[in-house]
């Protein structure tokens, strides 16, 4: 474990930073928040009102010059990920980017291609760090006959983003599939490997709220359903085996086996990827505590392939 104090900064002072990244940083004695950038400078200043030592501004370059951070979180809208990530990598700074990696596959590829990306860039996709995922994977990986992933949320009616960019197709890059799909697809790929996308249906082009994706994992059929305008909360994956249905309920933090036994986890996965990456940088964990940019790109290529199916356009995973 390193004794060095980690100078932490962030780009984007909205809901994701406030609810996830900032509490994770504050929970670590080795991390000091030194800077915060936001396009709305008053928002950043108001948020840091009780932390006068924290530099605030609107320029990522100035942030790097003025605060000399060791670690930067990028919590901006999807179309504004690439610039701060690449600036951090150019400066040799560890950077944790929110999912998806970018609003477009082209921008995501540009980030992955940076020489420092493999070492320094991580992506916040937390479901693979859920404490029940390993026992679930051990239970279902070899005998899966059918996979169903259901993701339902009231979306922005509950989330209430500080900046209303989710309804801007250019900024978001997509709808519910690009917003929530990476969480589900990353978990499924962690268990079953890369999928083949066979069909995709969306309720509306560009900014879909509801989507169904049919895939297969080495011949095992799988369906992903996402509803970002639901009146309920559900995040669960059900795998059918010869023994029956095994359910990993990420909302209730339960693994419900086909034999009726239930295993519970003490905490949910929401902060897991951020915590793992922060612990990697501070030296509290091994260097394996992150989702790499390459892995995030592979997930985004699955999303792009699904969008291609919905449009009737071939989008191979390459």
Segments the model singles out, each with a brief description of its role:
Residues 127-196, 313:
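Predominantly a Rossmann-like dinucleotide-binding segment in NAD(P)-dependent oxidoreductases
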């Amino acid at each position: 474990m390193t004794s060095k104090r980690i100078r932490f900064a962030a780009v984007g002072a909205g809901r994701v930073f406030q609810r996830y990244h900032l509490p994770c940083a504050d929970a670590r004695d080795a991390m000091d928040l030194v800077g915060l950038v936001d396009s709305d400078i008053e928002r950043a200043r108001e948020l840091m009102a009780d932390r006068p030592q924290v530099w605030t501004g609107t320029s990522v370059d100035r942030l790097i010059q003025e605060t000399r951070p060791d670690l930067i979180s990028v919590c901006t809208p999807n179309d504004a990920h690439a610039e701060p990530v690449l600036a951090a990598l150019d400066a040799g700074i560890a950077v944790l980017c929110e999912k998806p990696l970018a609003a477009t596959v082209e921008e995501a590829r540009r980030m992955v291609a940076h020489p420092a990306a493999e070492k320094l860039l991580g992506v916040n996709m937390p479901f693979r760090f859920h404490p029940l995922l390993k026992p679930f994977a051990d239970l279902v990986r070899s005998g899966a006959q059918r996979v169903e992933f259901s993701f339902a949320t009231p979306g922005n009616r509950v989330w209430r983003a500080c900046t209303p960019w989710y309804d801007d197709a250019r900024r978001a890059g997509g709808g519910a599939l690009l917003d929530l799909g990476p969480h589900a697809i990353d978990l499924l790929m962690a268990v079953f490997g890369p999928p083949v996308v066979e069909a995709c249906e969306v309720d509306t082009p560009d900014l879909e709220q509801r989507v169904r994706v049919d895939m297969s994992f080495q011949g095992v059929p799988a369906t992903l359903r996402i509803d970002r305008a639901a009146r309920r909360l559900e995040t669960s994956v059900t795998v059918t085996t010869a023994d029956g249905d095994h359910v990993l309920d990420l909302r209730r933090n339960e693994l419900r086996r086909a034999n009726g036994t239930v295993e519970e986890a003490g905490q949910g996965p929401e902060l897991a990827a951020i915590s793992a990456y922060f612990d990697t940088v501070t030296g509290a964990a091994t260097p394996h505590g992150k989702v790499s940019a390459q892995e995030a790109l592979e997930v985004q290529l699955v999303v792009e392939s699904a969008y291609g199916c919905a449009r009737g356009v071939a989008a191979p995973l390459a």
